[in-house]
Amino acid sequence: ILAAMSSFRNLFLATFLLAVSSIGGSAQKMRLDYKVEANIIAGGGEYTPFYLMNNRGGTVSFTPNTGYLRAAVMKDIDTTRRFSYGFGLDAMASYNDDVPAYIQQAYASLRFLALGLTVGSQEEYSLLWDKALSSGGWVWSGNSRPIPQVRIGIPEFVNFPWTHGTVQVKGEIAYGRFVDDKYQRHTHGAKENYTTGLLYHRKNLLLRFGKTNKRFYGIVGIDMAAQFGGKTYKGNKLVLDFPSDIKQYF
C-alpha cells in the first residue's frame, strides 16, 4: 500500500508542477486557486457507506479501504466584469479503485454580461439547494464523475426586464457524451447488454419571484435530463442502434 501511495504522490506532484508552470507567467494578472487534497477511507463491509460517497462527484470508490490524491488549478469567472473567463484542471490518482489515475475536471468558461458558455468536464451541483446540505435532486445528483459537455445559457439569476427586480430568471441547455464505453464493455460485455456512444442532454429554466433580501420569495421552474443515441451490444453482437440525428437533439 505504501509503495502504491508513494507512486501516486510522485505522479501528483509532477502533474501539479506541470499545471503551475504552464500558466505561471500569467499568475500575476489573474487570480488562480490551487488545491492539493488527500483522502483515505478505511473500514469493514462490502461497500463504502453511501454518506461518504454522496455529492463527491464520483471521486470516492464504492469499494472499502480506498483513497485518493488530488491536485487542481482553477480560475473562477469574475462576475463584476462585462466579459470574463475561467478554466479548471483537476487531476486525481486513486488507490483500490477501478482507474488508478484520471482527469476529474478539465473545462473552460466564458461569460458576457448574463450569458455563459462552458465546454468540458466540470463538477455540477444542485440548481437550488446548498450542495453541502442536499443529497441531490430527483433528476440529477452529484454522485458520478462529470460528463464532458457544452453548456450555454444564463447560469445565475438575473433580473427580468421591466419587473424592477421582483422577477429573476436563469436557465441553461447542455449536450454531452458519456465516456465510459470501455468500462461498460469490460464489466458487462461478456454476459450483459452494454451501451456505447451514449449522448447526454439537459435543460432547465427557473423563475424567482420576490426580492431575496425580503423574508419570503418563491421559485418555480423545470429541469429535464435525458440520455439518447448510442448502440447497445451483447458481447460483440449489436442489439439496438438508437437514432442520434438532428431530430433527437430537440
Model-flagged regions — what are they?
Residues 28-67, 78-89, 171-175:
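Transmembrane beta-strand segments of Gram-negative outer membrane beta-barrel proteins
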Residues 28-33, 75-86, 111-115, 157-170, ...:
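Short loop/turn motifs that connect adjacent beta-strands in outer-membrane beta-barrel proteins
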Residues 61-69, 100-104, 143-153, 197-203, ...:
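Residues that define the transmembrane beta-barrel architecture of outer-membrane proteins
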Residues 155-250:
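Signature for the C-terminal beta-barrel architecture of outer-membrane proteins
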Residues 38-46, 77, 91-95, 112-114, ...:
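Transmembrane beta-strands of outer-membrane beta-barrel pores
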Residues 46-53, 98-102, 129-136, 181-190, ...:
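Outer-membrane beta-barrel translocator domains and adjoining extracellular loop/strand segments
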Residues 69-75, 106-112, 119, 150-156, ...:
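Residues on the lipid-exposed face of transmembrane beta-strands in outer-membrane beta-barrel proteins
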Residues 55-59, 90-94, 134-140, 188-193:
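Extracellular loop and loop/strand-boundary signature of outer-membrane beta-barrel proteins
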